[in-house]
Amino acid sequence: MQQFLLKSKRVLSNHFGFFLFAVILLWLKTYAAYVTEFNLGISNTIQKFLLFFNPLSSAVLFLGLALFAKGKRAYIWLIIINLLMSILLYANVVYYRFFSDFITFPTLTQSNNFGDLGGSIFALLHLYDPLYFLDTIILIVLVATKFVNPKPIRVAKHKLSLVFVAGILLFSVNLGLAESDRPELLTRTFDRNYIVKYLGAYNFTIYDGIQSAKASTERALADGDNMTEVRNYLSSTYASPNPEYFGKGKGMNVIYIHLESFQNFLLNYKLNGQEVTPFLNSFTKDANTLYFDNFFHQTGQGKTSDAEFMLENSMFGLPQGSVFTNKAHNTYQSAPAILGQQGYTSAVFHGNYKTFWNRDEVYKSFGFNKFFDASYYDMNEKDVVNYGLKDKPFFNESIPLLQTLKQPFYTKFITLSNHFPYPIDKAEATIEPAKTGDSSVDTYFQTARYLDESVKGFIDYLKQSGLYDNSIIVMYGDHYGISDNHSAAMSQIMGKEMNAFENAQLQRVPLIIRVPGMEGGVQHQYGGEIDVLPTLLHLLGTDTKNYVQFGSDLLSPEHKQVVPFRNGNYVSPTVTALNGKYYDTATGKPVEFTDEIKQNEQMVQKSLKYSDQVVNGDLLRFYTPEGFTPVEPSKYNYNNRDKDKTKVKTTEDGETK
């Protein structure tokens, strides 16, 4: 044993010996994280090998930088680089546990949101998490205890060259094998899981940095010709209004109710013999209500902000980060601006602070007249949970604010209580939790019931006030509530194994539209959040033909029932496409690649590509539809000057006095 320690000390006291030891530790730790934390969809032997192999080139290249330092400083720099890479890996692990996604450079600009997460972050931490820094600790101990005794020499340049040649060679082999299994990996991939699976988490960070820089320069290089190409494409996908529904809600108020993290399976679901959402179940059966039961969320990293962006603009969120934080000052042709020029007053009600998701900036670009944020509400400790005000006091305190608005109005109420990790006071829980053993899944049903009761109270007010009879009410789920990291618990809830296909089907969220005097019913056509704006505008009697919108009217006979996901997958009534595999949507059985699938994929890729071009290039500055006046963000100010909330005043055009 003593001889082994002496030999180890001699090896580790050599720059290359210590370097190789650190490389092996980082390599194995990263691979362990891949197989235990990430669901990357490994499907063949090449992918299994690459998952094991891909951390090696990153470890060699990045840790190799430390060899440029002399003597003991090389060891110190190696430890620092190892620590930074460990922090990056662990940050991705924690982020993935909730979002099932990886951190990108644009998401770092959303870091001001993290301070409001409250208990959500702690629910994502595990007792074994310190192990992600075990290799760093080992390296520090070896140096601090002088177990290693570095010689004060500088490594020869030719040896340094060999290290980097080896790293580049390893990466080249990695990339070559990846391209053989997934051709054009770096040029036609919308899914970050692909890059991590084939090239690794560290190389993904470099790739993402390049993509982010490319996107930031796209605006400077854009011109009106880009917009012409986009409009030519959209003219071929436009769905004309259905005369049966066009203008049925003309002149009516619009009330959006944002159902936070609400998945469609909750509707009509019974837990222990009790309906989880009795009010919403009954509301979907109202004689004037259209309930879309094949409606999917299409959010990416922006989650709630992506959902809002799609509903207000009928354009997709970004492949990395959030439009709200990264493109807030673009030119938009949003719903509040379109309707504002028809005499509507627009407002958002939200029990969180206005800076969350950069709403106080992006709403100005959308043309919202007013934004009632947390500063208008009583944010006492009893009524605040997680991200902000609980839903029942939120709706109660929103009523006097709503009463200040001139009609017709376009409004949105953003709820918060039904948010991960779904905490709820025992006194407010009116249904027992599920019993899967997964606390987030179990309490999800209790917070969903609380949301259901909150919405009922608000609808009761609308009926009593008379607003119910002259307002279009739109309820929508913004994104999933339970990610695929909880598949074991969800298998118990759904009574079947939650594989990739079943998880894709679970991305359904409710879309419920009630128009007074219009015949309702269950609508089975497939659609997504991108389709809501053209559907609503047509109900209000505004044709969308001249607007730049990537969705289409769900009620139009010409609506194409292919629902793109942000990562390039899609679902349709016949086919569900997931990462190069295809399934019969009705049965879940694998199907062969067909011409129909090829056409669908081309349409999905074009829609995502052109939408990204419009957003990244800020192309709407080059095109103004006839009759539309571009928004002037400087006109809007959301500062709460009047703390007496029942006395908030608005001018005739809905702006703050």
Placement of each model-derived feature along the sequence:
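Transmembrane and membrane-interface helices of multi-pass
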Residues: 2-209
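Intrinsic-disorder-associated interaction segments
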Residues: 5, 13, 17, 219-223, ...
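Membrane-interface junctions
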Residues: 14, 71, 120-127, 223, ...
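Generic alpha-helical secondary structure signal
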Residues: 47, 72, 105-108, 112-115, ...
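General structural signal for secondary-structure boundaries
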Residues: 99-107, 122-129, 221, 304, ...
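Conserved acidic functional residues
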Residues: 133, 197-217, 261, 470, ...
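Membrane-interface segments at or immediately adjacent to transmembrane helices
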Residues: 174-251
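Solvent-exposed soluble domains appended to multi-pass membrane proteins
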Residues: 234-657
